[in-house]
UniProtKB/Swiss-Prot annotation:
The keyword Membrane appears for this protein: yes
Function recorded in the entry: Produces ATP from ADP in the presence of a proton gradient across the membrane. The gamma chain is believed to be important in regulating ATPase activity and the flow of protons through the CF(0) complex.
Homology family: Belongs to the ATPase gamma chain family.
Annotated disulfide bonds: none
Localization: Cell inner membrane
Molecular function GO terms recorded: ATP binding; proton-transporting ATP synthase activity, rotational mechanism
Annotated TM spans: none
Annotated Gene Ontology cellular component terms: plasma membrane; proton-transporting ATP synthase complex
Gene3D superfamilies recorded: 3.40.1380.10, ATP synthase, gamma subunit, helix hairpin domain
Name of the protein in its database record: ATP synthase gamma chain
Primary localisation category: membrane
The keyword Ion transport is annotated on this UniProt entry: yes
Amino acid sequence: MAGAKEIRSKIASVQNTQKITKAMEMVAASKMRKSQDRMAASRPYAETMRKVIGHLAHGNLEYKHPYLEERDVKRVGYLVVSTDRGLCGGLNINLFKKLLAEMKTWTDKGVQCDLAMIGSKGVSFFNSVGGNVVAQVTGMGDNPSLSELIGPVKVMLQAYDEGRLDKLYIVSNKFINTMSQVPTISQLLPLPASDDDDLKHKSWDYLYEPDPKALLDTLLRRYVESQVYQGVVENLASEQAARMVAMKAATDNGGSLIKELQLVYNKARQASITQELTEIVSGAAAV
């Protein structure tokens, strides 16, 4: 059994670590609330944009935009949103596992996959497993802007425009609540039709002014950008929630470990006192 002094040192070490994890839990909780506010502010725009685009997919368009047309799939692209920092439980690895499983279904069909990474954890992971990373952006902090994200988005849209990509997806964690974040893979291009049953039984006609091509070019690009930005802010809220939960679990585990060490310390101290008493009694008996 370890000595009492060594056990006291371990208890002090765990207590110091517990203070750190508790502070990180509180910081993550504060950042999560701010991230939730940003997510709530951007979600109505993203959802309305998705609804408008869903109307277009069901509409009788006088100009058929390339983003609305299905192609034979030879290469697909993924915009992957991960975190820049760790200590957020299984948030990243669960997302990566889901993506790897989907990529395998494509590669089994002879389809190649390109990856545009947002977040350093995704960059390091997919470089280590041999993924074809064609664009990346990292270090966006806790308040990302669209201008910081636009690089990888432009790379993938250009590849799609030039016919080098036939499908484009966004991969990110969807924030459900503090305890639940769901890894999701959503198709961006070609434009997915809305799931709204009412739309499937209606014919949508639009009048474009001044020019349908110019309007759709701008609108559909803005749609992709809005979905990517929404994915990033939701992933950020998911990151802070996962980190808060992970740090709370670490703090609670530290408390349990301290109790166990305190029990061991008490036993060691009791054994030491018993030994000293035995030695005193033995010495007195010898006299």
